[in-house]
Design a protein with these regions (language model features):
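A glycine-/small-polar-enriched, mobile loop at the entrance of the PLP active site in fold-type I
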Residues: 3-54
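Active-site phosphate-binding strand-loop segment of PLP-dependent enzymes
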Residues: 10, 109, 120-176
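PLP-dependent aminotransferase-like
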Residues: 77-142
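Active-site C-terminal subdomain of aminotransferase-like
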Residues: 188, 193-275, 289, 358-360
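Conserved PLP-binding catalytic core of the aspartate aminotransferase-like
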Residues: 284-314
């Protein structure tokens, strides 16, 4: 059976070359005589895997030496609690709410202190990003939190909030590794890996050194960043398979794609094809303000919810799967992460045009 074009928002596509390498090494990794899924996390083979994965991430993202990198269980949702537990030293933090996940992060933080929503785009159903330069930030806030790309609503930041002395914390789950990022602009970057990096089951956090070591003694051991980071992500058994797969994807980005600048060029070209089509006809609509349109997650609707259902069903039959929009938005959503080939987007546009002609 031919592989489908998978537009899932996550878990999502992985590069076929990476899958084939994992397949080839599934029963025996190197000369270990065992699968990565079986080996001890204290073995010399896995020690080499986790060390190389972190080193490759540092190269690919140009992460400075004064930042720690950690591989965490629990996904990005666990980070919603870890961030305030570790960083809310003044008892308050600023949150910009631009979608479901930033809202959930703010709600979680409110359990541990004052999580002030200083700006929100809820008034227009999260179809834009608030002007970060017009926000009244609290200079005594422990940090400013954003979700840099909004998976559900299809928006992304084009400018970052910058307040002197207040660290920026960003959830980058649905845009990480899609383009170069200046890590030095952030105090902490975290992301679930299941959208653009690896299979589900892990989050990665990149934390500036000066933010560590301030958690209260009452913070649970496994919710304290310092616990894991001081032990190079090996305080307890880490998500070994996810770390291995992350390493394969990073090597693919570095060696086959040519780095994040090249990946950005490819991604923007893919998104342009889809947005140009949406703007060139009147059947399908994208609700997002042009300036804030996501490169990774493209939302659209047809003239009628019943047609949306018909579109998704016929698309699946044609090999385009997981296009149904999130229940908060409806319609359709095409997640075109790094692993989605340009040909997949081209074929989707052809199918959309065919559907339009048959149903307009």
């Amino acid at each position: 059976m031919a592989r489908v074009c998978n537009f899932s928002a996550g878990p999502s596509m992985l590069p076929e070359k990476v899958l084939k390498q994992a397949q080839a090494e599934l029963l025996e990794y190197g000369d270990s005589g065992q699968s990565v899924m079986e080996m001890s996390h204290r073995s010399k083979w896995f020690d080499a895997i986790i060390t190389d994965t972190e080193a490759t991430l540092r190269r690919v993202m140009n992460i400075p030496d004064n930042y720690k990198v950690g591989f965490f269980q629990g996904g990005a949702t666990q980070q919603f609690a870890m961030v305030p537990l570790n960083f809310m030293t003044t008892g308050k933090a600023d949150y910009i709410v631009t979608g479901n996940f930033s809202n959930l992060a703010a709600k979680e933080a409110a359990k541990f202190g004052e999580a002030k929503i200083v700006a929100s785009s809820k008034d227009r159903n999260f179809t834009y990003i608030p002007d970060v330069n017009a926000i009244d930030y609290d200079k005594d806030a422990s940090y400013i939190h954003i979700c840099q790309n909004n998976t559900i609503f299809g928006t992304q930041y084009v400018e970052l909030p910058q307040v002197e002395g207040v660290p920026l914390v960003a959830d980058m789950s649905s845009m990480i590794l899609s383009k170069p990022v200046d890590v030095t602009k952030y105090g902490c970057i975290y992301f679930g890996v299941q959208k653009n990096v690896a299979p589900a089951g892990m989050a990665i956090a990149i934390v500036r050194d000066d933010l560590l070591g301030h958690a209260a003694d009452t913070v649970p051991t496994m919710m304290n960043y310092t616990t894991l980071l001081a032990k190079d992500s090996m305080y307890n058994t880490p998500p070994c398979w996810c770390i291995y797969m992350t390493g394969l994807v990073l090597k693919y980005l570095e060696n086959d794609i040519g780095g994040l600048a090249k990946m950005q060029e490819i991604n923007e070209a893919k998104a342009k094809v889809l947005y140009d089509y949406l703007d060139g006809q009147d059947f399908f609509k994208n609700p997002v303000e042009h300036r804030y349109r996501s490169t990774m997650n493209v939302t659209f609707t047809s003239p009628d919810p019943d047609l949306d259902k018909k579109f998704c069903a016929e698309a699946a039959d044609a090999g385009f799967v997981n296009l149904k929009g999130h229940r908060l938005v409806g319609g359709m959503r095409a997640s075109i992460y790094n692993a989605m080939p340009a040909e997949g987007v081209d074929k989707l546009v052809d199918f959309m045009e065919k559907f339009r002609k048959e149903n307009a």
